Amino acid sequence: MLSSSSLYAAIDLGSNSFHMLVARETAGSIQTLAKIKRKVRLAAGLDKQNRLSQDAMQRGWQCLQLFSERLQDIPQDQVRVVATATLRLATNADEFLQRAQEILGLPIQVISGEEEARLIYQGVAHTTGGPDARLVVDIGGGSTELATGVGAKTTQLISLPMGCVTWLDRYFSDRNLEAGNFERAEQAAREMLRPVAASLREQGWQICVGASGTVQALQEIMVAQGMDEYITLPKLRQLKEHAIQCDKLEELEIEGLTLERALVFPSGLAILLAIFQELDIKTMTLAGGALREGLVYGMLHLPVDQDIRHRTLATLQRRYLLDVEQAKRVSTLADNFLQQVARDWQLDNRCRELLRSACLVHEIGLSIDFRQSPQHAAYLIRHSDLPGFTPAQKKLLATLLQNQINPVDLMPLSQQNALPVNQAQRLCRLLRLAIIFASRRRDDTLPAVRLRVEGETLRLILPAGWLSQHPLRAEMLEQESRWQSYVHWPLMLEETPA
C-alpha cells in the first residue's frame, strides 16, 4: 500500500503556467504519480511599473486552491514551492505571496535566476541520457535560463530576463506574425545573449538539451511531420517562415502544434533562434525533466547516475523479472554482429547503444503472456516512463521489440524518427538474428558466426556442418531468411568449407 509519507511534491509558480508534480522514489529515480498544470499567464498581468494586476493574482490564487487539495495528503517537509521570474520582478509580489501561502499552508521561496538554472540543470542531469558535458536551455514565460555542466556539477549558471510571455507582449502585441516582428524579437534576444555568449561557448558541451514548453512544442511538431527528433537551425528557420505565412497569431496553424501552445510559440521560437545563432548550437534534444524534477531529486538527495539509461533498463529487468543472463547473452551476440558490419552499414555508437538497450529488455512481453509477446513488449515500452531515453528513442525501442520475431512489419520502422529508416531496419535484422542464435539460452552453444554485407545483402557464414548438427536453429534461420526476403532484405546462409 502506498502511504502518504512516501509522496513528494514540487510546485513551480512560473510566469506562464503554474505546475505541480507529485512523485515517489523508486529504484533510484522518481515515479510520477500526478502532473497538474494551469495556464495562469502571470507575466501578462505586469504593468509598466511591474505591478501585478488583481486579475492575474486572482488567476494564480484560484489555481493554488486546486493544488492545495492534493497537498493535504503529503507531509509538509516533502513539499517544495518555488516562484520564478514574474514574482522576482513584481513590486507587489508580497501581496500575492502572502495570500498564496495562506491557501497552500506552506512557505513559498522566490528563487534567484541562478538557483532556477541550477535546479533545472539537476532535473536534466537526473532524467536525460547522453554525454556528460551538456548545455541546458529553458525558455520560461518571463526568463530564460542557461546552464553548462559535467555530470551533476554545474560550471556556469545564467538567467536572462526574456521569456515567451514577455516577448509576446513586447514584440507580437499587435498579433501580427510579420517578418519585422520576428526580426525585432530575435535581435533583442541576441543583444541580451551577447554579453554571456562567449563565456558559455568557452565552457563547451557535447550535447545541448532544451527543457521548456517551446522545445516540447517543437518536438511534437517534428514527430507529427515525420522529421527526426533533433532541433536544428534550418528547421527553426523553416518554422519561422511558415509562421510568417500564417500572417496573424490567431491564424497560426502548424501540423503538430497544439492550440494551447500556439499563443506563445512565435515568441519562444524567436528567442530560440537567437540562442542557436549566438551560441552556435548545431543540434538540440528534449530534456526528460527540469525544474520540478530538480526540486524532487533535491529533497530525496539521490546521486546522479553516470548512466541513466542503464539504471532505467536495470529497473525494468527487476520490475518484470526478466532473465538477465539471457538478455546479456543476446546483447553480447548482437553487439558482435553489429561490430562486424558497422563500417559497411554505417552503424555508429548511437546505433550500438540503442540495439543494446533493445536486447536487454527484449523479453519484457513475456511478463504478460507468451502469445503475442512482441506486441506486449512494444506496448510496455511505448507506455513506460524511461528516464534517459527521448520520446523518439522510446518509439524506436518499441518498434524493434515489436519486430523481434515473426514476419517483419516495415510500417513502424519507417514511422520512427530516432534513426534513418535504413539504420533502424539494419538494427532490427541484427536483433532478430541474435535472438535466434541465443535461443538455447546457453553460452556453450553459440557458434562463431561471421557476417558479410554487400549493400542490403547479409551473408551469415557458419562453421562447417553447423546447420546439420543444429536442425531446429537451421530451420529457424531458413524461415528467417524467407521472412527477410519478403521485405527485400536478402539473407544468405553459408558454411565454411570442411
Swiss-Prot record:
<keyword id="KW-0378">Hydrolase</keyword>
<dbReference type="Pfam" id="PF21447">
    <property type="entry name" value="Ppx-GppA_III"/>
</dbReference>
<comment type="pathway">
    <text>Purine metabolism; ppGpp biosynthesis; ppGpp from GTP: step 2/2.</text>
</comment>
<dbReference type="InterPro" id="IPR050273">
    <property type="entry name" value="GppA/Ppx_hydrolase"/>
</dbReference>
<dbReference type="InterPro" id="IPR043129">
    <property type="entry name" value="ATPase_NBD"/>
</dbReference>
<comment type="similarity">
    <text>Belongs to the GppA/Ppx family. GppA subfamily.</text>
</comment>
<dbReference type="GO" id="GO:0015949">
    <property type="term" value="P:nucleobase-containing small molecule interconversion"/>
</dbReference>
<dbReference type="GO" id="GO:0015970">
    <property type="term" value="P:guanosine tetraphosphate biosynthetic process"/>
</dbReference>
<dbReference type="InterPro" id="IPR022371">
    <property type="entry name" value="Exopolyphosphatase"/>
</dbReference>
<dbReference type="GO" id="GO:0015974">
    <property type="term" value="P:guanosine pentaphosphate catabolic process"/>
</dbReference>
<dbReference type="GO" id="GO:0004309">
    <property type="term" value="F:exopolyphosphatase activity"/>
</dbReference>
<dbReference type="Pfam" id="PF02541">
    <property type="entry name" value="Ppx-GppA"/>
</dbReference>
<dbReference type="InterPro" id="IPR003695">
    <property type="entry name" value="Ppx_GppA_N"/>
</dbReference>
<dbReference type="InterPro" id="IPR030673">
    <property type="entry name" value="PyroPPase_GppA_Ppx"/>
</dbReference>
<protein>
    <recommendedName>
        <fullName>Guanosine-5'-triphosphate,3'-diphosphate pyrophosphatase</fullName>
        <ecNumber>3.6.1.40</ecNumber>
    </recommendedName>
</protein>
<dbReference type="InterPro" id="IPR023709">
    <property type="entry name" value="Guo-5TP_3DP_PyrP"/>
</dbReference>
<comment type="function">
    <text>Catalyzes the conversion of pppGpp to ppGpp. Guanosine pentaphosphate (pppGpp) is a cytoplasmic signaling molecule which together with ppGpp controls the 'stringent response', an adaptive process that allows bacteria to respond to amino acid starvation, resulting in the coordinated regulation of numerous cellular activities.</text>
</comment>
<dbReference type="GO" id="GO:0008894">
    <property type="term" value="F:guanosine-5'-triphosphate,3'-diphosphate diphosphatase activity"/>
</dbReference>
<dbReference type="InterPro" id="IPR048950">
    <property type="entry name" value="Ppx_GppA_C"/>
</dbReference>
